[in-house]
Every structure is written in structure tokens, then in C-alpha cells.
């Protein structure tokens, strides 16, 4: 295994079971090793020993399915037993929202370090569930941009309806799908799709600044936040997801290249057994994009890191990241200029 001395985020994979079957899901078909029933007490004892041996601390812990609500009892137990020891400021659960219960909401609201990300999957969440989700103290909504939904504006009316149901305006963000083998090609983005997407983002930016539209302001805020976040870390490592700064494990201690694929072919080792040899050879070329001369010489590399190593549409991804950076830099410059001018005017008004 690689040196783990600089791990920061921790991904824990509980299984791949899900109550939905979305065509754009990144999990690939097969019978993942992660789905075997693990002994929680055994996992906790071995994980505590791992922390003691390595003196590891993690900046964040992410709990993954499948659909995490199908594993909620196990997730809750693991959280309670590891949270005091891992040093994480945030524990994040990403769910499709359809199975959230009052017990889940009440539990999360008792712990300020638990953050819930609710994935919007084409209106499958009922109004009653949205009202319940709205009672969470810490959550956001995320949706995907894909071939069948090329503009955030296509969800604007849904978002406003959800806000009315909740009586609040949660943060909302949009990510482009990753066109790996798990995602059906019907959802893969084309260059024309991206042109339409960025045209809509320009319109959203204008509506956010001129009309002060709250939905558009939220979309732009997340767009810029994600760009700045990517800029901080993607270009300094060999792959955006696979590196010595992220640990992805299942309840047996198996380590994975990334949390988006928990198939046996993606197992790289085991934190409980350093001598463990993966049962199947790794079938992914982790650096097929990120280590190429074209990627490393590209001015966009610091914010994309070469893109996803599982992508089947690398050229489209490249076009996305380059255009995103062009717009983000322009909008950030305008924002900084506005802040400087506003600060200057305030100072002038304070002078005698």
C-alpha cells in the first residue's frame, strides 16, 4: 500500500444497495465485495487500532452507499463510535432523500458536525419528504447536469416549490455527470450540450446580478465556490480522486481507488492487513489523462487535475473545465473589483 501519512478525507463504503436505479449512476454492475455483511464490532476495534498505530486524523468523513438510508443503523453506530477519535470537523452523508425519516432528522440535528447532501433525482422525492428534509439544520441540495438536463434553469420551478414547502432556501449546486461505464451513454454530455449549458450560465449570472434572482444567485455562488475549491487541490496531485490524501475503505478495511466504484477490481489494499494482496488486478489506468503532457502543460490543469480517470468523454470534460475556468476567472475578477470599489466608497463616506 502507499504511504498514508497525509490522508485527509475519509470515505467509508457501506454497500451498493439502492432503492432507485438512475441511468446516470456511477456505480458499475457486478457483485461488489463491499456488499458482504461485515461485523461492525470487528470493524470498529480494528479501525481504532489503525488510528492508534498510525496516529491518523481526518478532516472529514463521508458515508456512502448505494443509498445510505438503507444502511442508516450501521452508519449511525459507526459515526457514534469513531467521531470522537478521527478529528473530523464534518461528517457528510449523501442521500437520494426518498427514505429519510424523522428519526434521521432528529439524530442529525443533535450533532452539528453531520451535514446531509440531498441529491435531486428528477422529482422522486415527495412533498412530505421535502418538508421533513427542510427540518434538518445542516443540508444542501445537489443536482446533475447531463444530456437530458443541460441547464440549471430547468430545475428552477422545482427548487422554488421545494423552498415554499420547507419555508427556507437551502444551498443548491449543480455538477456535470461523469461519463464512466456505470453511467448510461444516453446521459453523456456532447459539445453542443455544453455550449447550451454555459450559455444558460451566462444568463443565470446576468439574472443573479441584474434581477437579484435568489435561485440564480445560489447557482452562481456554488459555481464559483466549487471552482475555487478545485483550484486549491486538484493540480497538486496525480489524480483528482486517487492519491495519498484520500482514504476510501469498506467495513473490511479494503481500500479503493475511489468511492465511486466499489467493485473488487478497484481494491488496492487493506488498512487492517498491510500484507493483503488484492484478489483481482486493478483494471484502471489511473493516470491515463492526469499524467499526460497535454494535461500537465494545460493552463487549466490546476483546477481540473486531468479530469476523471474513468471518463469515456475526456475531450468533452476538457472543454467543460476550460470554459468553466474562463467564466469563473472573469466573474471572480468582477466580484473582487466590486468589493474594492465598495470598500473605497465606504472609506470615503467615513472621512470628515
Positions of PLM-derived features:
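Canonical Radical SAM [4Fe-4S] cluster-binding loop centered on the CxxxCxxC motif
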Residues: 2-42
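Exposed loop/turn and edge beta-strand positions of beta-sandwich/beta-sheet ligand-binding modules
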Residues: 8, 57-59, 243, 294
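Radical SAM/AdoMet-radical enzyme domain recognition
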Residues: 11, 40-64, 71-192
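Cysteine-centered iron-sulfur cluster-binding motifs in ferredoxin-type domains/subunits
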Residues: 14-21, 67, 295-302
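Flexible loop/turn segments at secondary-structure boundaries
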Residues: 20, 69-70, 100-101, 148-150, ...
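Residues that scaffold the ATP/ADP-binding catalytic core of kinase and kinase-like folds
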Residues: 25, 103, 307
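A C-terminal junction/extension of Radical SAM enzymes
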Residues: 171, 180-264, 303, 352
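Flexible mid-to-C-terminal extensions adjoining Fe-S/redox cofactors in radical SAM and related proteins
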Residues: 254, 260-352
Amino acid at each position: 500500500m502507499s504511504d498514508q501519512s497525509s490522508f485527509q478525507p475519509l470515505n467509508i463504503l457501506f454497500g451498493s444497495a439502492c432503492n432507485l436505479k438512475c441511468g446516470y449512476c456511477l456505480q458499475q454492475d457486478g457483485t461488489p465485495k463491499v456488499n458482504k455483511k461485515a461485523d461492525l464490532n470487528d470493524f470498529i476495534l480494528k479501525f481504532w487500532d489503525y488510528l492508534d498505530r498510525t496516529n491518523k486524523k481526518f478532516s472529514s468523513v463521508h458515508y456512502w452507499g448505494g443509498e445510505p438510508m438503507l444502511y442508516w443503523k450501521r452508519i449511525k453506530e459507526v459515526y457514534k463510535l469513531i467521531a470522537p477519535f478521527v478529528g473530523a470537523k464534518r461528517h457528510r452523508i449523501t442521500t437520494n432523500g426518498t427514505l429519510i425519516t424523522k428519526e434521521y432528522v432528529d439524530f442529525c440535528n443533535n450533532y452539528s458536525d453531520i451535514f446531509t447532501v440531498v441529491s435531486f433525482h428528477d422529482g422522486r422525492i415527495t412533498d412530505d419528504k421535502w418538508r421533513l428534509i427542510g427540518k434538518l439544520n445542516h443540508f444542501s441540495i445537489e443536482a446533475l447536469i447531463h444530456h437530458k438536463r443541460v441547464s440549471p434553469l430547468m430545475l428552477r420551478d422545482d427548487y422554488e416549490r421545494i423552498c415554499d414547502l420547507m419555508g427556507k432556501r437551502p444551498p443548491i449546486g449543480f455538477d456535470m455527470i461523469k461519463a464512466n461505464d456505470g453511467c448510461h451513454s444516453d446521459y453523456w454530455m456532447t459539445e453542443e450540450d455544453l455550449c447550451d449549458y454555459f450559455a444558460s450560465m451566462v444568463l443565470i449570472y446576468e439574472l443573479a446580478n441584474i434581477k437579484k434572482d435568489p435561485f440564480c444567485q445560489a447557482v452562481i455562488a456554488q459555481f464559483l465556490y466549487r471552482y475555487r475549491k478545485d483550484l486549491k487541490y486538484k493540480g497538486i496531485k496525480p489524480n483528482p480522486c486517487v492519491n495519498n490524501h484520500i482514504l476510501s475503505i469498506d467495513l473490511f478495511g479494503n481500500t479503493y481507488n475511489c468511492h465511486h466504484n466499489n467493485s473488487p477490481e478497484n481494491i488496492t489494499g487493506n488498512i487492517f492487513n498491510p500484507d493483503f494482496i488484492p484478489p483481482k488486478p486493478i483494471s484502471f489506468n489511473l493516470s491515463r489523462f492526469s499524467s499526460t503532457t497535454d494535461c500537465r502543460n494545460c493552463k487549466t490543469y490546476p483546477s481540473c487535475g486531468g479530469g476523471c480517470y474513468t471518463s469515456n468523454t475526456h475531450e468533452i470534460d476538457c472543454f467543460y473545465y476550460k470554459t468553466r475556468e474562463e467564466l469563473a476567472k472573469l466573474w471572480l475578477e468582477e466580484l473582487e473589483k466590486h468589493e474594492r470599489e465598495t470598500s473605497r466608497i465606504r472609506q470615503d463616506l467615513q472621512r470628515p
